[in-house]
Amino acid sequence: MSQKLILVLNCGSSSLKGAVLDNGSGEVLLSCLAEKLNLPDAYITFKVNGEKHKVDLSAHPDHTGAVEALMEELKAHGLDSRIGAIGHRVVSGGELYSESILVDDEVIAGIEKCIPLAPLHNPAHLLGLRAAQSIFKGLPNVVVFDTSFHQTMPEVAYKYAVPQELYEKYGLRRYGAHGTSYRFVADETARFLGKDKKDLRMVIAHLGNGASITAVANGESRDTSMGLTPLEGLVMGTRSGDIDPSVFGFLAENANMTIAQITEMLNKKSGLLGISGLSNDCRTIEEEAAKGHKGAKLALDMFIYRLAKYIGSMAVAAGGLDALVFTGGIGENSDIIRERVIGYLGFLGLNIDQEANLKARFGNAGVITTADSKAVAVVIPTNEELMIAHDTARLSGL
């Protein structure tokens, strides 16, 4: 009998991303992306054997309709009977979950309890989870939380300096994100360098449209840049990152903006997009900065400066630095950003190897610092889907 496959789902409020993986080899046999869910022109795109095709979802434009279309596609390729379990990415498990878990009614209630911590994401994850339970009847479901990896942070790192009853009553603290990526990359970095991860003090930068950075020591998260929500920390595609909280009062008073408007502005209209006035896409920002566009140049400069500053602070949290790791779409592909960031870090004993830095792109891992550097900087491609598949297989007994 052929080995059971794992279906991995990642649901957003208007999207559903899916992949069918062979847990042993990590091969992706089928992938899909549903977009514009809950709108009349919803659709889903499937990719199988390098071929793409689109299916209209206008008759059932919700998450359930997307999962139904996925089931039909699996049947068409004879894959439906080979699915052994389903793994779901969930943004926030709050303090309830420090590791991945097999889904039951109690877990669903727990994810619901964490909705205030991820109001944009957790409701969508629940829609996808319920759709999977109803359409893939009898299959085990596993949830993998973005926040779990950071539950090892010490109190000095996760607490905010506010009245403590706010933490006790409302769970107001730093939770972090991208934990599944950090767990995968920490393991891969140790394997790539031929070391035990418990012997490595790592600072890992997960850089994409959402960007964060984490200090890892003894294989565990010691501190991270994202906070109560993913808004804290680095300059991102559309998020401001760190900002003086009194900005809310200032804008309410002087610009007549509501809390909801300010929150949306800081999450969706700030970052690279807000500074440049052009785009949230780092590739566009790099191209336009090279052509002399002032806004793009400033956006790139601010992104790099904030990142370098955070690397220094995360080296403190890790107790030193053995390996600086770049991952995520920007971290894996932008040799320009990596070189400029490392240019700030000579005081940590890091020197860029320009040739190696150019080679470490498009899925290629590699050390990008010179042999005489006191620590290494390395590029390690992330694979959150594979990490979710591994957890799902383990917890469902496959």
From Swiss-Prot:
This is Acetate kinase 1. Substrate binds at residue 89. ATP binds at residues 17, 206-210, 281-283, 329-333. One of its GO terms (molecular function) is magnesium ion binding. Pathway: Metabolic intermediate biosynthesis; acetyl-CoA biosynthesis; acetyl-CoA from acetate: step 1/2. The lineage of its organism: Bacteria, Pseudomonadati, Pseudomonadota, Betaproteobacteria, Neisseriales. It is found in: Cytoplasm. GO terms for biological process: acetate metabolic process; acetyl-CoA biosynthetic process. Homodimer. Its cofactor is Mg(2+); Mn(2+). Belongs to the acetokinase family. It comes from the Bacteria. Mg(2+). Can also accept Mn(2+).
